[in-house]
From Swiss-Prot:
Family of this protein: Belongs to the universal ribosomal protein uL22 family.
Keyword entries, A-Z: Ribonucleoprotein, Ribosomal protein, RNA-binding, rRNA-binding
GO terms assigned for molecular function: rRNA binding; structural constituent of ribosome
One Gene Ontology cellular component: cytosolic large ribosomal subunit
Organism: Myxococcus xanthus (strain DK1622)
GO biological process terms on file: translation
The protein's role, per its UniProt record: This protein binds specifically to 23S rRNA; its binding is stimulated by other ribosomal proteins, e.g. L4, L17, and L20. It is important during the early stages of 50S assembly. It makes multiple contacts with different domains of the 23S rRNA in the assembled 50S subunit and ribosome. The globular domain of the protein is located near the polypeptide exit tunnel on the outside of the subunit, while an extended beta-hairpin is found that lines the wall of the exit tunnel in the center of the 70S ribosome.
Name this protein carries in UniProt: Large ribosomal subunit protein uL22
Subunit note: Part of the 50S ribosomal subunit.
Length: 114
């Protein structure tokens, strides 16, 4: 059985989130949460929260029949979201653009074969 969770419009660069996602791809859920707990990256907190949400979705979807210890991170993908454009005033009446990037993160958890 598979369970999914999505985090959309996260106000962080997809490149920075991808480094955290690579750490936990293919790992058991318990190990992934432990890795994220001790990772000193800003992206670790929202990804940890997302995995906990996917675990809650799995238990709710199966009405409590799923064993959380058998779940692993099957896929985790980080996609680019829309960029927010802001402008910073500069000298002589000019302005330069600032691009505030967003990201979409999708997690799929699956049960390991016994």
């Amino acid at each position: 059985m598979e369970s999914t969770a999505h985090l959309r419009f996260l106000r962080m660069s997809p490149r920075k989130i991808s480094t955290v996602a690579e750490l936990i791809r293919g790992k058991p859920v318990e190990a992934a949460l432990n890795i994220l707990k001790f990772t000193k990256r800003a992206a670790a907190k929202p990804v940890e929260k997302l995995i906990k949400s996917a675990v809650a979705n799995a238990t709710d979807k199966s009405k409590g029949q799923v064993d959380v210890d058998t779940l692993y991170v099957k896929t985790i993908s980080v996609d680019q979201g829309p960029t927010q454009r802001r402008f910073m005033p500069r000298a002589m009446g000019r302005a330069t653009p600032i691009k505030k990037k967003t990201a979409h993160v999708h997690v799929v958890l699956a049960e390991a074969k016994k």
